Amino acid sequence: ETAIVLLWFAAILNFRGNRFTGRLSNMTIWGSIVPVLLIGTIGWYWFDPSIYWAAWNPNDLPFYDAVKQSISLTLWGFLGFESAAANADAVENPKKNVPIATVAGTLAVAVVYILSTNVMAGIVPNIDLLNSNAPFGLTFVYMFNDTIANIVMAAMVISCFGALLCWQFTLSRVFKSAAEHGYFPKVFARVNSNDAPVRGVFILLAVETLLTLFTASDSLREQFEVLVNLAVVTNVVPYVLCILAVPTMMRMAGVAESRIKRFNYVFGAGVIYCLYAIYACGFDAMVGSAVAVSIGLVIYVLRKAWATRKAHRLQQSID
């Protein structure tokens, strides 16, 4: 129930428009940046190599199996790196700022995640991290005390809400852009006086609410794993399609064929990685993603058929 309330509250705040969402997100993000940076810097004082090595592959899995089990969570950490591109219509000078934000943001997240999580693994025993619903807060308990840990957890909850706010904003913008290009019904493109696609947001909220109810579990960790795998697969499918489209886009931009061929190796490696990630997420996630993709394809085909009939009727009326 709490998750559903937060979903709706974050969506309603987005009705205030781009600037309000941006300002609020810029404030809330510090609730996670500061604790993570503290762990990655002063956390080394509490770092115990013996605890770290005990947490290294505790189940003695072969390398292949260890990679398979961790790949979905790794990708989850980077989901959303395309947000700058998705929100390009709300960015000043997008041709310059979107590529900078995408590359810089991805590199920054990589450094922060790798540094902070490795330090945590050397502070808190692996079994305690595994059974905790708030691993960052637990780390601050080991570093300081319960009071400071509670303050940190409160700040990170606020930061997570800010991230949810951004996700709701980005999702509504993606559907708005798709609707403007004819891929989704026009209802997703209708905006209020603050340029917020209110009706589309309510439709998305209904879907999110149902998804939250269907994946409900007594264990927060189990529900998190289900949603992570489903989110990774449904996001990786568009990544594959985008990778396959890049050579065509490069040719349209007049890029030399020799340069495109050199990049084909990178594109191929990206496709293989994405397909392996889909496989690693498991059968249930693939089935759920297949259902979601199928629904999207049905909507797309129906929209195209409707647009074709409309254009044909218009042409007949002109003739």
Where are these regions (language model features)?
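Helix-loop-helix connectors at the membrane interface of multi-pass transporters/channels
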Residues: 1, 35, 90-95, 100-108, ...
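Transmembrane helix-loop boundary segments of multi-pass membrane transporters
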Residues: 19-29, 151-154, 213-240, 254-261, ...
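A generic transmembrane alpha-helix motif of multi-pass inner-membrane proteins
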Residues: 222, 234-238, 248, 261-319
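TM-loop-TM module centered on a large, flexible mid-protein loop between adjacent transmembrane helices
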Residues: 103-165, 184-231
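Helix-loop-helix junctions that connect adjacent transmembrane segments
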Residues: 27-153, 285-288
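Hydrophobic alpha-helical transmembrane segments of multi-pass membrane proteins
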Residues: 5-12, 68-75, 151-165
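Membrane-interface loop-to-helix entry segments
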Residues: 1-47, 61, 102-107, 232-240, ...
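Structural signal for membrane-spanning alpha-helices in multi-pass inner-membrane proteins
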Residues: 10-14, 36-43, 113, 117-121, ...
